From Swiss-Prot:
Belongs to the CRISP family. Venom allergen 5-like subfamily. It holds the Pfam family CAP. SUPFAM superfamilies: PR-1-like. InterPro entries: Allrgn_V5/Tpx1_CS, CAP_dom, CAP_sf, CRISP-related, V5_allergen-like. Expressed by the venom gland. The lineage of its organism: Eukaryota, Metazoa, Ecdysozoa, Arthropoda, Hexapoda. This is Venom allergen 5. It is found in: Secreted.
């Protein structure tokens, strides 16, 4: 397993859990796992539409807004390797970030989201991604990332990180204490959220 050699510190998710592609969720009742083709398209479309909106200077929210337009906003494409790593982590039903998810090609960033409902349905991909988009309301474009409150804006900044080119996500839906929970993990390459770099180049 070459993934065991990739990470200088921490254990790679595929090194640690890569032998099984089945959920390992303890007492949680797993209803479904994986990302359908429709969901895959929804994830990529939703990301690219939002990236374009920000790049064109049409995002009015912020602390303060609006967000400045961008000149280097790559269009994201789906990457199956990133998705496999994301799915393997999602399958652990352990909300938070894994230790290492890099590939031989590049370091990899990550967004995670979780939402529960008491009804019989699960929140959609778009609902979870919108939670990341909405963090823009707390982002101050006049300060660098280091001087923003990273815990409040880090999902937004990875979503619109100009140099990121590829995305791959994993998802698991489970029931716990009658709560219908949807857990989404998206991996991004090359990674964003470097404290000493701009989120994107400005026009």
């Amino acid at each position: 397993n070459n993934y065991c050699k990739i990470c200088p510190k921490g254990t790679h998710t595929l090194c640690k859990y890569g032998t099984s592609m089945k959920p390992n969720c303890g007492g949680k009742i797993v209803k479904s796992y994986g990302v359908t083709n429709d969901e895959k398209n929804e994830i990529v479309k939703r990301h690219n539409e939002f990236r374009q909106k920000v790049a064109q200077g049409l995002e009015t929210r912020g602390n303060p807004g609006p967000q400045p337009p961008a000149k280097n906003m790559n269009l994201l494409v789906w990457n199956d390797e990133l998705a496999k790593i994301a799915q393997t982590w999602a399958n652990q039903c352990n909300f938070g970030h894994d230790q290492c998810r890099n590939t031989a090609k590049y370091p990899v960033g990550q967004n995670v989201a979780i939402a529960s409902t008491t009804g019989n349905s699960y929140q959609t991909m778009s609902y979870l991604i919108k939670m990341w988009e909405d963090e823009v309301k707390d982002y101050n474009p006049h300060k660098d990332l280091m001087h923003n409150n990273f815990s409040k804006v880090g999902h937004y900044t990875q979503m619109v990180w100009g140099k990121t080119k590829e995305i791959g996500c994993g998802s698991v839906k489970y029931i716990e204490n009658k709560w219908h929970t949807h857990y989404l993990v998206c991996n991004y390459g090359p990674a964003g959220n470097y404290m000493n770099q701009p989120v994107y180049e400005r026009k």
